[in-house]
Amino acid sequence: MALGDLMASRLVHSSSSSAAPSAALPNHHTNHLVDDHLPVENGPDPRRDVPDEEPPPPPPPQVALLPQVVVLCEQRHEGFDEAAAAAAGPSTSGPVSKWRPKDRMKTGCVALVLCLNISVDPPDVIKISPCARKECWIDPFSMAPPKALETIGKTLHSQYERWQPKARYKLQLDPTLEEVKKLCNTCRKFARTERVLFHYNGHGVPKPTANGEIWVFNKSYTQYIPLPITDLDSWLKTPSIYVFDCSAAGMIVKAFLERLDWSSSSSASSSKDCILLAACEAHQTLPQSAEFPADVFTACLTTPIKMALHWFCNRSLLRDSMEHNLIDQIPGRQNDRKTLLGELNWIFTAITDTIAWNVLPHDLFQRLFRQDLLVASLFRNFLLAERIMRSANCSPISYPLLPPTHQHHMWDAWDMAAEICLSKLPQLIADPNAEFQPSPFFTEQLTAFEVWLDHGSEDKKPPEQLPIVLQVLLSQSHRFRALVLLGRFLDMGPWAVDLALSVGIFPYVLKLLQTSAMELRQILVFIWTKILSLDKSCQVDLVKDGGHAYFIRFLDSLDAYPEQRAMAAFVLAVIVDGHRIGQEACANAGLIDVCLRHLQPENPNDAQTEPLLLQWLCLCLGKLWEDFPEAQLLGLQSNAPEIVICLLSEPQPEVRASAVFALGNLVDIGSPSLNGADDDSDDDEKVRAEINVVRSLLQISSDGSPLVRSEVAVALTRFAMGHNKHIKSVAAEYWKPQTNSLLKSLPSLANINSSNVYSPSSLIQGSSGLASHIGPVLRVGSDNSATARDGRISTSSPIATNSIMHGSPQSDDSSQHSDSGILLRENASNGGLNYSRSRPIDNGIYSQFIATMCNVAKDPYPRIASIGKRALSLIGVEQVSMRNSRLSNGGAHPGETSVPPSSNFGMARSSSWFDMNSGNFSVAFRTPPVSPPQHDYLTGLRRVCSMEFRPHVLNSPDGLADPLLSSSAAPSNMGLYILPQSLIYRWSCGHFSRPLLTGSDDNEEANARREERERIAMDCIAKCQRSSCKMTSQIASWDTRFELGTKASLLLPFSPIVVAADENEQIRVWNYDDALPVNTFENHKLSDRGLSKLLLINELDDSLLLVGSSDGNVRIWRNYTQKGGQKLVTAFSSVQGYRSAGRSIVFDWQQQSGYLYASGDMSSILVWDLDKEQVNTIQSTADSGISALSASQVRCGQFAAGFLDASVRIFDVRTPDRLVYTARPHAPRSEKVVGIGFQPGFDPYKIVSASQAGDIQFLDVRRASEPYLTIEAHRGSLTALAVHRHAPVIASGSAKQMIKVFSLEGEQLTIIRYQPSFMGQRIGSVNCLSFHRYKSLLAAGAGDNALVSIYAEDNYQVR
């Protein structure tokens, strides 16, 4: 199968496909009861008159009870901090860059020295008869000695020239010492810094001396003159390579090594720049057998195919029928792979490369086989020399020393190829027109490589065929298959990419981008995706060779699969990443228009574009615009902001975050200016576009995904840098210190995030952002009708369209409860560094920005809060000590401590940064009063914060909180380095470094674990449905040691573990079978604390712990049962934007739909889709707030809500009206609904509701709104209700130290008052109750003694 088809069918990507977003919640989770809605309130219901009507047949138990939806398990939930992003993105240094030769080199000059002295044998050589005579395949005795010497010299020249035709060759025949010296000096002078090759044939002179001296002649050829190796080395210098073809050549190598060791202290690189090849060891003489030429070593190095075949001929089964002279008649050319000779040379190169790759260390392989073409050829041929000469008891040696290779099994493959060649040779010589049949060698090796791919892994030995795959890329007939297999190999991980690059694959795949073969496009894009996911440095080569145009054309082709085009967008993003030449080349090639064209569907009714493609189109644009004003201008001219802004509502967080990244890089961060002078280059169009971008970013600053919010915070910080001067000016106007002024009627920003939270979208509705931020409090001459039911700001308010109200701090006699505050340090206009655009934009945008960043600084996700604090410090807003006063009906929240009044004075410089442990940031807005404050606006206000500004020394000349921003402490470009870094690009790169073609083994393990848990769950459900449910036995009691008692508890379904938490949001995990603590951690480190609920997500898989805080913040943890191993998966504010939500937010979770429901003292219910990490709002249509929520475990999108006015409502997100049932089951005197739940089993029509007055009402929504059963469980003070998911039992608890367990028929099964001890101590006031999901177990948390008790039936057995 082609890799393109394989990718289409098996490609795995992190972005999930879903339908286009709509205003209403889509029914994207199909359910078995999707069309069977509950009757609408007061609507006709024929079933009400048929009391005994049987409910519809239940669905299969496993479908209804064991939901298949899994959320928050994408790669983004594994973490996207700086460390994760750095590990995911392409590298430009370190181990991955070692594949690229640091100093490519070529041999520029070759010195050939032949000391043959034909017809005169050296005195220390005794020759046998017959003996080896041929030199360069020429018999020197077949012609006159001078002619023979000249012919041999020219032949050696031609043999070397085939390997390096561009080098300069110098030949010396039987030279003197002076001639050799002159030759060496000339070669070095010509070669300069290039390598010089010195070839020495000493067959006509004595062996080298013990000191490593070689011999030459005197002028009259009457004496042998020694040439010290030290002199030779000093003439040739380095880099150089020596070939010594003489007996006892090892003596020369030994002397060289001694010299290198001696000189290593002065020249560390000399040993690496000197390469030696010697024919034999110091004690050996050259072979004299007549089957070899006299210069067998030289023959192997310069004519390997001929030498190999001659040698093999005598050992082949064909030796009797083969004539040696036919070897010289092999048809074809060595550089033509479609001929017999060319194919043999190709196979030989592949085999010797493979042997070297598998035997040598990779750095040595790189140096010898990839740095210099001539050196690589000589070392390939040296491997042949070792094989042939060792058969004659002669061992060639080299420096660097190579391990033995003469018995490597790949030589068997060569022998087979040679034998096939020899068998064809007679026929081809007899019939020159005979059709050439290629060798099966490469086909077989590719098959072997494919077998390895089916069974290999990183932990096993690397595939030895990898160098052969590289060679196969040269052949058009094998290329496609080789590329597909190479793609499969690269997909195995970064280690595979590094191996392929180390073997030398890069120049081959780079060259292939110049081909126009359509069938190669998909696989080449995939291969380049894998390469660039490891090493970014290849971007330079791609642009240099024009490769970027190849990927732009592919990206613009509609016939390719979207996933493949996403890969092309990734490649282009890497090309332009921090590479100005690449940015310019891609911009000139029209990349911006191509990306924008594919970001918007041609037809609005078309299905959603592949999310991965959208993500990488945005990232590509963002990288192209990054720090490149010319490209930014092109984007603005192409209406890029409008197009990209449309993606901010996409269902995939990765797409939204990437769109924010692209928009953020269109925001001008300004340029350093020492005098703050304006630059007239900005035009109105750019200003309007930037306003549009910033407004859009402010609107999504409370997105449900930290990935998105993080990018928004980074982009807004860039905006703060670009508009630093103007934002400071606006902030200074509002926060100008006024001595002894009184601030009245102003809420703190801490309250704005808790009881008075505003959404950025509501801020943008008014022209004055800060005014709208505090509008309900500061509004003058208006009434409460200016505020909408859901707490959002009405633009009809006069204050919402005018300047900010003002006031002064209250006196020191106010409440002593402390809070954290923000102070703006005025900018001293001293010519210091200011990063700012030339022209200010609307001050309302600046005000909205400040208010939004104050909320960002309190984000529940730590990294985002840190960015928000940094952005505020950029505009000179810093923390100061605050004191807030409460109204008579208010009070301190848990976790707030008191400070003395003097804490406002003399603030130390170190306090200029926000306190990382503080969650309350209160701001006093100050402007001259327009009219007296109206006391009407204080009605209902929970807190009023006051801030007193005290004079203190400003150590920073420009008023910035960070000394790094001071002009006296930073260079002119320091501001560029303090901007927080976006992580989305590098984090997204990690997707392509992971396997894309095969599923992970982890998925198989997870599936097996889930199947086992499903089996256990079904068994437990069947048992608990038949149990008596009398919780009479206390099987465990745990003193949690919570200071404020236990607020929530949760029993895990598949392990004997209970999780408990208190009002301070301390989370503790306990094993109740072993009575041992498992883990303890804090939900957060902020001072503003309060817990609402613990929920379990993905209970059948790797479960996650959701901790809902009473202020609406949600944090979700994984690994919470590992001591110290808990990790934050995601965090968000569930009620951001709702001023009246209060601190009593309630939650419930529905696994079937992936929805989290949240509400409180507000008129809306927030439905969070945790798959998309987006929210939709349902109006409750009630006059009071919500006090309890319960999601149906049978029907997706259906949930029940209990209200503060004791009413009950059922909602279904699938119906147009949402509200499907309303009832007031509790008496008018009753207080709020404390607990509500759907009754156990498959019947979705029955619910249970308990009020604080103590009554429990059973309702059947198919009948009248009156309850069909009432239980007076407690006489007031009911604090908790628990409904078992499967067993027919409910439990209630009261503050009067009592727990009661009832059947669904109202029978009281158990009453628990005392601990099962000798003294019979009372159990304590009940704060929380929770049933085990699949067993008859009940956990109860006490409020006064912090005990968590677990109750079971009498026959419960501890494992």
Swiss-Prot record:
> What's the source species for this entry?
Oryza sativa subsp. japonica (Rice)
Gene Ontology CC annotation, any one: cytoplasm
Biological process (GO) annotations held by this record are: cellular response to amino acid stimulus; cellular response to starvation; positive regulation of cell growth; regulation of autophagy; TOR signaling
Q: Where is the composition biased (Low complexity)?
A: 806-819
| Function, in words | Component of TORC1 complex, which is an essential cell growth regulator that controls plant development. Acts by recruiting substrates for TOR. Acts by activating transcription, protein synthesis and ribosome biogenesis, and inhibiting mRNA degradation and autophagy.
What GO terms are given for molecular function? protein-macromolecule adaptor activity
Q: Where is the composition biased (Basic and acidic residues)?
A: 32-50
- Subunit record text: The target of rapamycin complex 1 (TORC1) is composed of at least RAPTOR, LST8 and TOR.
Q: Which stretches are WD repeats?
A: 1041-1080, 1087-1127, 1139-1178, 1181-1221, 1228-1269, 1273-1312, 1321-1359
Q: Which domain of life is it from?
A: Eukaryota
Look up keyword GTP-binding and say if it applies.
no
Region of interest called Disordered, as start-end residue ranges on this chain = 17-64, 782-819
Sorted alphabetically, which InterPro entries does this protein's record hold?
Answer: ARM-like, ARM-type_fold, Raptor, Raptor_N, WD40/YVTN_repeat-like_dom_sf, WD40_repeat_dom_sf, WD40_rpt
The UniProt keywords, alphabetically, are: Developmental protein, Growth regulation, Repeat, WD repeat
Protein name as catalogued: Regulatory-associated protein of TOR 2
